[in-house]
Design a protein with these regions (language model features):
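Charged phosphate-binding loop/patch that engages nucleotide di/tri-phosphates or the phosphate backbone
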Residues: 27-30, 175-200, 206, 210, ...
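Alpha-helical substrate-recognition element adjacent to the catalytic core
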Residues: 27-116
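Short catalytic/ligand-binding loop motif for oxyanion handling, primarily in non-cytosolic enzymes
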Residues: 55-58, 108-112, 137-140, 158-161, ...
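A structural signal for isolated positions on well-ordered beta-strands in alpha/beta enzyme cores
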Residues: 98-100, 130, 150
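A short, structured active-site edge motif that brings together acidic residues
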Residues: 102-106, 114, 122-140
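Conserved Lys-Pro-Asp/Glu-containing loop-to-beta segment of HAD-superfamily phosphomonoesterases
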Residues: 132-133, 137-162
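Acidic, Mg2+-coordinating phosphoryl-transfer loop and its flanking beta/alpha structural elements
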Residues: 150-188
C-alpha cells in the first residue's frame, strides 16, 4: 500500500494510536511507501539507521530471543546502548547538513525507538525522523531524495537497495557484522574504542575538540570514495577547526 500524507512520520504514527491496535498494526505492516508532500526535498540529506549503527545491537539479544525483542513490555529497543562516537558524529554533521534518522520498526516498538532518539539525539526534529515497516525498501519512506542522499546503515540489504536507487551507501561496521568491498564504510567499533580511550583523560573543552577531530578523521576516510556528494561534505571540516 502506498500512502500520501501532508504531515511528518511522527504525526502520522500518532494518528494511528486512535485506531484499535490490530488495525493500526495491519495498516503499518502493509505499507510499501509513504510520500511526504510537505517534506519532499530535492536537496541531499544524510540518513542514519539506529540498530547497529547509532546503537549497539546484540547478537545474543541481551537475554531475549529474537521474538522477545519485539515484545513492547521488554523495552529492548528503548534500552539499547548508544554508540557515543556516532552520536557525536551526527551531532556535528547536523549543524551543517540535513541529517535524518531512518529506522525499520515493528509497530509495537516505535514508541521506544522514538523515545531513544529524543534522549540521545534531541537536536533531531520530528520532521527528520522516519520509520518504516520491517523488510521494506527504506528509499520509499524518506523525503523523496534518496537518489541524492547518503544512507549510513549496518545491513547489506538496506545498503544495496539505497545504492540501486542511485544514493550513496555507507556501511557501519559494528560488533556483529563485517566490512565489504562494495561499500564505503565507517568502522564504528574501532572508532568507539578510540573515543573511549581519549575521553578517559579529557575535560569538557577537550571533548569538544574531540568532536571536531571525529568529523575531520571520518571525512578524510569518506572522501577517498568516488562520490561527489561525500566530497562536498568535506566543507564541514573547515567549520570544525
Amino acid at each position: 500500500m502506498e500512502l500520501n500524507i501532508d504531515t511528518n512520520c511522527i504525526t502520522y504514527l500518532k494518528s494511528l494510536q486512535s485506531l484499535p491496535l490490530q488495525q493500526a498494526i495491519s495498516l503499518w505492516d502493509n505499507l510499501k511507501e509513504i510520500n511526504y508532500a510537505k517534506l519532499k526535498s530535492m536537496k541531499p540529506s544524510i540518513y542514519i539507521d539506529i540498530d547497529g549503527t547509532l546503537a549497539y545491537f546484540y547478537r545474543n539479544g541481551r537475554g531475549f530471543t529474537y521474538e522477545e525483542m519485539f515484545f513492547p513490555e521488554n523495552h529492548y529497543f528503548r534500552n539499547l546502548e548508544p554508540h557515543i562516537y556516532m552520536i557525536y558524529l551526527v551531532e556535528t554533521l547536523s549543524k551543517f547538513r540535513d541529517v535524518c534518522i531512518i529506522s525499520s520498526a515493528d509497530y509495537k516498538t516505535i514508541q521506544d525507538k522514538y523515545e531513544w532518539i529524543k534522549e540521545y539525539l534531541p537536536f533531531i526534529s520530528d520532521d527528520n525522523i522516519f520509520f518504516c515497516p520491517l523488510g521494506v525498501d527504506k528509499t520509499k519512506f524518506v523525503k523523496g531524495n534518496a537518489e541524492k542522499s547518503i544512507l549510513i546503515d549496518d545491513y547489506n540489504l538496506n545498503l544495496e537497495a539505497w545504492d540501486k536507487n542511485g544514493g550513496v551507501a555507507i556501511k557501519a561496521i559494528n560488533n556483529i557484522n563485517t566490512p565489504t568491498e562494495r561499500f564505503v564504510h565507517i568502522n564504528v567499533r574501532d572508532k568507539e574504542n578510540w573515543l573511549k580511550s581519549q575521553m578517559e583523560s579529557s575535560d569538557d573543552e577537550q571533548i569538544e575538540k574531540l568532536k571536531a577531530k571525529i568529523i575531520e578523521m571520518q571525512i578524510k576516510n569518506w572522501v577517498k570514495a568516488d562520490t561527489e556528494f561525500i566530497k562536498q561534505v568535506l566543507n564541514i571540516n573547515e567549520r570544525c577547526n
